[in-house]
Amino acid sequence: MASLGVSEMLGTPLNFRAVSRSSAPLASSPSTFKTVALFSKKKPAPAKSKAVSETSDELAKWYGPDRRIFLPDGLLDRSEIPEYLNGEVAGDYGYDPFGLGKKPENFAKYQAFELIHARWAMLGAAGFIIPEALNKYGANCGPEAVWFKTGALLLDGNTLNYFGKNIPINLVLAVVAEVVLLGGAEYYRITNGLDFEDKLHPGGPFDPLGLAKDPEQGALLKVKEIKNGRLAMFAMLGFFIQAYVTGEGPVENLAKHLSDPFGNNLLTVIAGTAERAPTL
């Protein structure tokens, strides 16, 4: 019988096959060692276990008792984190100052609220930026394609204009379409029309690229989704405040700031020394 030994030299796995005395060794040696695939192009077997280990290490950063929390360990003792925040849910940093998630039913409810708002915020942030950027740099997306001014066109009895094409949608049709399409989809989700085990992360037809087929990768994607969603919610709040204060969209605000960082920033707007004085 042959036994297999593994060694490493300069980071390259080396496989040696030891031949026992009963397998007719050479006369010059009682046993023979044969180097197998020293310079083989085939990936070594431990590579898969290494990838699994890296994924497990990454999961440990975001789930479980040793996950990252909202303050460093030196500033927050983990014993101060509420027991119901045990790291089983994506995005759990141990932060619930108002105790909103003490009751399990409330925890599930607020988790759903946050995730749905996060998804809408990510779509909304893209919808605020992309049309205005396209319009500013060459495309014809309407008179200004600024998010709050586009909606005002419908209030004035106008129709929408995208890439130079008029879309015959007035205010009534826009409201009806929103209520029917969005409200219908939300009702279908609440009543579990497709009978999914996880209403918040259904997968299946809602994951056409199969990004979350691997459970561990799916868990990491949940973390990325909620982190980006929270950032998008703050971005939307910033867009609202910018529009109220400056009367401009986020792309125009950014362009003016980049063209003159010291003349167009938060301090100059508050002080009223910028060209666009605040309307507060």
Curated annotation (Swiss-Prot):
Q: What is this protein called?
A: Chlorophyll a-b binding protein CP26, chloroplastic
> How does the entry describe the domains?
The N-terminus of the protein extends into the stroma where it is involved with adhesion of granal membranes and post-translational modifications; both are believed to mediate the distribution of excitation energy between photosystems I and II.
**What is its quaternary makeup?**
Forms heterotrimers with LHCB3. The LHC complex consists of chlorophyll a-b binding proteins.
- Source organism of the structure: Arabidopsis thaliana
Residues spanning the membrane: 110-130, 167-187, 231-251
Any single Gene Ontology cellular-component annotation:
PSII associated light-harvesting complex II
| Function, as annotated | The light-harvesting complex (LHC) functions as a light receptor, it captures and delivers excitation energy to photosystems with which it is closely associated.
Binding residues annotated for chlorophyll a 4, in chain numbering = N228
Q: Per the similarity annotation, which family is this?
A: Belongs to the light-harvesting chlorophyll a/b-binding (LHC) protein family.
Gene name tied to this protein: LHCB5
Binding annotation for chlorophyll a 5: K224, Q242
Where, by residue number, does chlorophyll b 1 bind? Answer: F70
